[in-house]
UniProtKB/Swiss-Prot annotation:
Species for this entry: Clostridium botulinum (strain ATCC 19397 / Type A)
Residues at which Mg(2+) binds: 103
Record entry for activity regulation: Allosterically activated by ADP and other diphosphonucleosides, and allosterically inhibited by phosphoenolpyruvate.
Positions annotated to bind ADP: 21-25, 154, 185-187, 211, 213-215
The protein, known as: ATP-dependent 6-phosphofructokinase
Biological classification of the source: Bacteria, Bacillati, Bacillota, Clostridia, Eubacteriales
The enzyme's E.C. designation: 2.7.1.11
GO CC, alphabetical: 6-phosphofructokinase complex
Similarity field: Belongs to the phosphofructokinase type A (PFKA) family. ATP-dependent PFK group I subfamily. Prokaryotic clade 'B1' sub-subfamily.
GO biological process: canonical glycolysis; fructose 1,6-bisphosphate metabolic process; fructose 6-phosphate metabolic process
Gene coding for it: pfkA
Length: 319
């Protein structure tokens, strides 16, 4: 192993820069040449590859986003596109590739490994939807961003004695809504993993009003969607002024938290070690506080287990 490369793919996540920094500096310390690939698999196919040194990653650990940029790539979805990508990697003398991204990015790394490319994946996604790992890079920053937003919404919601319906990211995984719902004291948490009844929700809101609640905070994962429509329905049924807020892409930005910076650094260090030791087609994660690695096929096949205990806690504390 003499030359490795790193790319970021899919949706950006805070902490990606910390991971890039750790890959580059660990690789250089181990005597490797390190290349950066811009704009994910799209940049790989177009040969947007450059050599990186320790100064390339100076002053980035505190920055959100990714200095390597990220992009979707339809061509890479084709067999011809992947073969082209593999040839370009070999032409640049790249022996190992670190891919930072979500499940789609991992599927790409998985397919490249079948073409003889040594790959290691790092979980970079705010959704926390990769089941093999307890946490993904970017999740902690995202939930802190959401928590800050709902704290502010609670202030104005209380002043006006209204209901706030807040839609957060999470298509198939409701972790952002669940974690921030518990931490932010939400009265209701609506997530893809659990069915909900709008009429029952309205009844709960009215019961809360009778108990003297000054406001109601409803957190809604985008996988369920319909924040605007739900807000209108709540107001029609309860007669209580209701407003909807869709937080959107603000959840992906911002300076990464201490936890995300450390997690990204630990995972990236492990990724370089794996490549040096000759291991390929692996992904890095964290379980019970320990950095782990596993086969990428096995990791993608792991079924996600829902945190029922945390959901039960949220339900009890919201009353």
């Amino acid at each position: 192993m003499r030359t490795i490369a790193v790319l970021t793919s899919g949706g950006d996540a805070p902490g990606m820069n910390a991971a890039i920094r750790a890959v580059v500096r660990t690789g250089l310390e181990k005597g490797l040449k390190v290349m950066g690939i811009q704009r994910g698999y799209n940049g790989l196919i177009n040969g947007e590859i450059f050599e990186m040194d320790t100064h390339s990653v100076s002053d980035i650990i505190q920055r959100g986003g990714t200095i390597l940029r990220t992009a979707r790539c339809e061509e890479f979805r084709t067999e011809q596109g992947r073969e082209k990508a593999a040839k370009i990697l070999k032409a640049f003398g790249i022996d190992g590739l670190v891919v930072i991204g979500g499940d789609g990015s991992f599927h790409g790394a998985q397919l490249l490994s079948k073409l003889g490319i040594n790959t290691v994946g790092l979980p970079g996604t705010i959704d926390n939807d990769l089941a093999y790992t307890d946490y993904t890079i970017g999740f902690d920053t995202s939930i802190n961003t959401v928590l800050d937003a709902i704290n502010k919404l609670r202030d104005t919601s209380t002043s006006h004695e209204r209901v706030s319906v807040v839609e957060v990211m999470g298509r198939n995984c409701g972790d952002i809504a669940l974690y921030t719902g518990v931490a932010g004291g939400a009265e209701s948490i609506i997530i893809p993993e659990k069915e909900y009844n709008a009429d029952k929700l309205c009844k709960q809101i009215l019961q809360g009003k009778l108990k003297g609640k000054m406001h109601n905070l409803v957190l809604l994962a985008e996988g369920v969607g319909g924040a605007n429509e739900l807000a209108k329905y709540i107001e029609e049924v309860t007669g209580i002024e209701t407003r909807s807020t869709i937080l959107g892409h603000i959840q992906r930005g911002g300076s990464p938290t201490c936890m995300d910076r450390i997690l990204a650094s630990r995972m990236a260090y492990k990724a370089v070690e794996l490549l040096i030791s000759g291991k390929s087609s692996r992904v890095v994660g964290i379980k019970n506080g320990k950095i782990i690695d596993m086969d990428i096929d096995e990791a993608l096949a792991v079924e996600r287990s829902f945190d029922q205990e945390l959901y039960d806690i949220a339900t009890i504390l919201s009353k």
